[in-house]
Amino acid sequence: VATSIDSYTGKPFSGTLNYNVQRLADGTPLTEKFPEADFPFQGISYKAKYRSVSMLDNSILRDLAPENAVEINDLDAKELGLETGDMVRVTSATGSETFGKILARPGVARKTIAVAFGYGHWEYNTNAYQVDGKDVAATSPREVGMNLVKVSLLDPTFGDKMYGLAEMQSGMCARNGGAYRIEKV
């Protein structure tokens, strides 16, 4: 990165470890477009011990951890009147939403939603379909839980084109960060 040029700004990267605020493709800070007062949470996904793409079909591992949770700091949960097990709606700043159960714990950073990936699939045989005229039944355990990717932000600076929020240093889809709110349902 030290010798690379930022493809969005045309300026060189710093070359040293530093903090960069999340920005949209036009350089606007994310919090300028989506104020923290409206969307106070950022999201982070992590790999669960017993759940990944290679383990989705292992029924024993699925039984150990059948669903994930919307994990938030216990102090944030208290401020929102939430308790572990409460069902919530997670809404992104660009309008997509998903649902999950709260897990309140002190090990999550304040104003952060932590979600184990490998859950909440909307494909991977979660829908019935046909192959060569033969019906293939859905395998529902793969759709249990929530998936943070479903509510990833779109970058509104691209107008009517659908373009996901990008991580500025690499240009890849931003899997972490974003702007979200949580509401009890």
PLM regions with names:
Residues 1-60:
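Long, low-complexity segments enriched in small/aliphatic residues
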Residues 5, 54-71, 75-185:
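Long, contiguous, secondary-structure-rich segments that constitute the structural scaffold
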